[in-house]
C-alpha cells in the first residue's frame, strides 16, 4: 500500500488540489512523474512498477478529460538516474534485476533535467530522457512479444528463484 499511496495517490491528490486553481485561471500545465518502470515492467519491482503504471494510466485519462479546460499534461518516464534512491537500490538488487536494468545506463541528473525541460518547452506529452530508454519504450510498445522474449531470455540466464 505504501508505494501506491506515495506514487499514485500522492500524484492524484496534488492534481485534485491544483485543478480548482487552473479552472479559475482558465488554463494550466501538469507535469506527472512516472518512470520507465511505468511503461515497461521490471523484474523484482512489482509494487513500484504497478504504482508507476497507475500514474501513466491516470495521466492518459486526465489528459483527455481536462483538455477542454485548457489543462495540459506532460508525462515524464525516466529510467534510473543518479540519485540516493538508485544508490540504495544498488545495495540490494537481485541478479535478475541487475541483468534487466543494466540495459539502460544510469543517467546524470542534469541530463534528465535538461531533457525534461526541453520536452515541456516543446509541448511533448511523453518525455522519456535518454536515447536508449526511448528506444526500449518504443520497441516494447511496437513489438511487445519480441521485448518479452528478450527479457525472459536475459532473466532465464541468471534466474535464482525466490529468496
Model-identified regions with their sequence ranges:
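A short helix-coil junction within the Rossmann-fold of NAD(P)-dependent oxidoreductases
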Residues: 17-26
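Active-site loop immediately N-terminal to the catalytic Tyr-X3-Lys motif
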Residues: 40-46
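Residue(s) in the substrate-gating loop at a strand-loop-helix junction
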Residues: 35
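Active-site helix of classical SDR
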Residues: 15, 51
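Active-site-adjacent segment of SDR/Rossmann-fold oxidoreductases
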Residues: 40, 61-72
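SDR active-site lid
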Residues: 68-131, 149
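Active-site Tyr-X3-Lys motif and surrounding loop/helix of classical short-chain dehydrogenase/reductase
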Residues: 1-5
